[in-house]
């Protein structure tokens, strides 16, 4: 069944009420999802994206009921991931010569998934256009690392519809298609959850890319996403939220999460929260036991928070596995402008809290003092936990923006070479992040004073996660 989006544009996608796991099991889609595909019928007929591979046969059957497949003139693939382009093999078996418009990186991804290099690929770049008749064009905009290297958006003139790919979407299933028709609380919760868990690592790319798109001075009457609703009522509201979320976002909120073996660390978490509330009753404090909580809800709360307290019991001298896994995930999400403190209980030997503190610092958090308790905390120990909460509340609520912690030596004191000795600065050609040899990249164990030639080959750009081969000498230093 198709749904009219606007004029000659129809939704021909697939709802998935049952899906509960995405990206393996990394993202819990508790409200299902949809795979949005769009059919445009002008003088030329255009299909934008397909659906998840598990619905390939249904998709092609439904599409055939809408249009003779041989009448499809162009296929646009904004993103090569299987939930977008998964039905290509089934579709191209019917219309093998139909041109597929996508980015150069998408060809590599599509061939990697479908293994059909003979398909009729047409590479497009930012600013390229495709005439579809009736005075209308498609304009392509590359959006690398939002959230794959192959990503792009497609804008349709005349109808002023932006087919935005994953950006501005959400894993949210509803029989109604448009943003003004669905439950608004559910919608915006899922929008923020989607951004926090998927797009946060690329926040530094969001603002310049949105600015670039706005720079085309094109009207936007609708934003047609790849998942969830189509934004037809005040579509720029979600754009404004993205600009807000991309700027080191935080609320007056503290998240506490922990894992525990014998409830001892849970007791500490509760007492710390009590201490925070005593000093600052206005701050929102959320507590999660990771063994019983939705991981993505925890990460969304971390995204919203100004600080996080992480607790773990000690097991075999290390932290609990679920805590270790979640901290590793936070490292990949690259949260910014947030503080952290570790706490936990132990028996005959400790070790977990110290390791946890180190991992949180490696993940980019500004660290406050940690807290340890031996065995089950008694009344005196619980009072120490409450005092720790009071101290945290004062530090995080009243202090200015986080400063460099004492554990990290100031960069100025660690630099022993002059800039001239270290060679040129290098700039990522994709996201424009600059590697300064004088500063190094501590999160990847590249010490200050490391020339680019000595940076390990497995180095990844901290902003877009691409390798050394995309770096060029900074233009201002090139000879």
From Swiss-Prot:
Flavodoxin-like domain ranges (all copies): 254-393
Cofactor: Fe cation; FMN
Record text on cofactor binding: Binds 3 Fe cations per monomer.
Keywords: Cytoplasm, Electron transport, Flavoprotein, FMN, Iron, Metal-binding, Oxidoreductase, Transport
Rubredoxin-like domain span: 423-474
Keyword field contains Flavoprotein: yes
Residues where FMN binds: 260-264, 342-369
Binding annotation for Fe cation 3: 428, 431, 461, 464
Region span, Zinc metallo-hydrolase: 30-210
Pathway annotation: Nitrogen metabolism; nitric oxide reduction
GO cellular component: cytoplasm
Binding, Fe cation 1: 79, 81, 147, 166
GO molecular function: electron transfer activity; FMN binding; iron ion binding; nitric oxide reductase activity; oxidoreductase activity
Major localization listed first in the record, in broad terms: cytoplasm
CDD domains attached to this UniProt entry: flavodiiron_proteins_MBL-fold, rubredoxin
UniProt-annotated binding residues for Fe cation 2: 83, 166, 227
Subcellular location: Cytoplasm
PANTHER family: ANAEROBIC NITRIC OXIDE REDUCTASE FLAVORUBREDOXIN
Protein role: Anaerobic nitric oxide reductase; uses NADH to detoxify nitric oxide (NO), protecting several 4Fe-4S NO-sensitive enzymes. Has at least 2 reductase partners, only one of which (NorW, flavorubredoxin reductase) has been identified. NO probably binds to the di-iron center; electrons enter from the NorW at rubredoxin and are transferred sequentially to the FMN center and the di-iron center. Also able to function as an aerobic oxygen reductase.
Family: In the N-terminal section; belongs to the zinc metallo-hydrolase group 3 family.
Subunit architecture: Homotetramer.
Record's protein name: Anaerobic nitric oxide reductase flavorubredoxin
Gene this protein is translated from: norV
